[in-house]
Amino acid sequence: MYKRQDVGYGQLAWKLRSDPRVVCLERTNARYLTHEQVPDELDFASVDVSFISLKLILPPLNGLLKDGGHAACLVKPQFEAGREKVGKKGVVRDPAVHLEVLEHFLDHAGDAGFTVLGLTYSPIRGPEGNIEYLGYLEKGPRQERTFDLKALVDESHQTLKEHGEGGNP
């Protein structure tokens, strides 16, 4: 069974919408998802949210995943950093802000009952050119893992800089 949730509507491809394995929950804020809406415990979730911090999404997500379940989360600095750290057109260019965002993501994931198994940068920039990151989480007791966040941020900026400031490399 596949579940798809979106605060918007009419965005899910018809092929998926008409698949009986897909339950589409439109006009639904992920912060308030409950077991009544998603009665089956999920093995996996992919999270790509806008205009809201993952800090607010991870706790309810934990309640929907089965123990040992996994989630892939797109970490968007423009929605994690705070308004005062976001530049023109919603773009975060400062590597120090990216580093801070990733440190907070690790903390928020752990606080919400997840272990971060993997962390990398997305090879695809956001629409305005934002560098974004991907976190791979597992529900269960928090296990401390070490990531070289500075090296990750440096690599993301160096690699994606070679592809210009546009959306996709």
Write out the residue ranges for each language-model feature.
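Short, small-residue-biased leader/transition segments that mark boundaries at the very start
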Residues: 1-2
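Conserved SAM-binding strand-loop segment of SAM-dependent methyltransferases
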Residues: 20-31
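A short acidic, Gly/Pro-enriched loop at the edge of an enzyme's catalytic core
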Residues: 31-44
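A short glycine-rich, Lys/Arg-flanked "PGG" loop and its adjoining helix->strand segment in the class I
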Residues: 55-72
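Short, glycine-/aromatic-enriched active-site segment of Class I SAM-dependent methyltransferases
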Residues: 77-94
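Short alpha-helix
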Residues: 98-112
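Conserved S-adenosyl-L-methionine
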Residues: 114-123
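Flexible, glycine-/basic-rich loop-and-beta segments that form/coincide
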Residues: 131, 135-169
